[in-house]
């Protein structure tokens, strides 16, 4: 049991203040390394992330502009349909006796088809905006995850060399051996 507590005391030992040198204790250097890696990721990743978001924002704005242009075209079609409607109404006054019900049906069909077209264009615009937003969010998430993963792998590869890795394994095997002896 004494060996077990000694190993924990050894692992918790920090070098005294005022000394300078390389600290090979992996438990003491990980917070420092992680803070440096996080600082570098934030510093360099922020620009990439901002550029990615700006590009997505421009795509979404272009999509909105295109949808607005389509909407304006539909409004123009509506105005044309209304002009045709006025023309049909004047002709309806002339031919009221011969075909009033048929003209009314054509009028309603024009209004309904134009209204339906406007609704479809509005739905298309909203779906396009939602799709682009989801696509942008997913790509940003994927990019951030990849950058964090690459940073973590780089940190692990730079921190663990073969000698340090073997010493850590041997220390853990020794701890497990002493734990087994104390339990027996």
Swiss-Prot record:
Keyword terms: ATP synthesis, CF(0), Chloroplast, Hydrogen ion transport, Ion transport, Membrane, Plastid, Thylakoid, Transmembrane, Transmembrane helix, Transport
Protein localization: Plastid, Chloroplast thylakoid membrane
Residues annotated as transmembrane: 27-49
Domain of life where this protein originates: Eukaryota
Protease is among the record's keywords: no
Record membrane topology: Single-pass membrane protein
Primary role: F(1)F(0) ATP synthase produces ATP from ADP in the presence of a proton or sodium gradient. F-type ATPases consist of two structural domains, F(1) containing the extramembraneous catalytic core and F(0) containing the membrane proton channel, linked together by a central stalk and a peripheral stalk. During catalysis, ATP synthesis in the catalytic domain of F(1) is coupled via a rotary mechanism of the central stalk subunits to proton translocation. Component of the F(0) channel, it forms part of the peripheral stalk, linking F(1) to F(0).
Family: Belongs to the ATPase B chain family.
Oligomer and partners: F-type ATPases have 2 components, F(1) - the catalytic core - and F(0) - the membrane proton channel. F(1) has five subunits: alpha(3), beta(3), gamma(1), delta(1), epsilon(1). F(0) has four main subunits: a(1), b(1), b'(1) and c(10-14). The alpha and beta chains form an alternating ring which encloses part of the gamma chain. F(1) is attached to F(0) by a central stalk formed by the gamma and epsilon chains, while a peripheral stalk is formed by the delta, b and b' chains.
Extra remark beyond the main annotation: In plastids the F-type ATPase is also known as CF(1)CF(0).
Protein name: ATP synthase subunit b, chloroplastic
Organism: Lepidium virginicum (Virginia pepperweed)
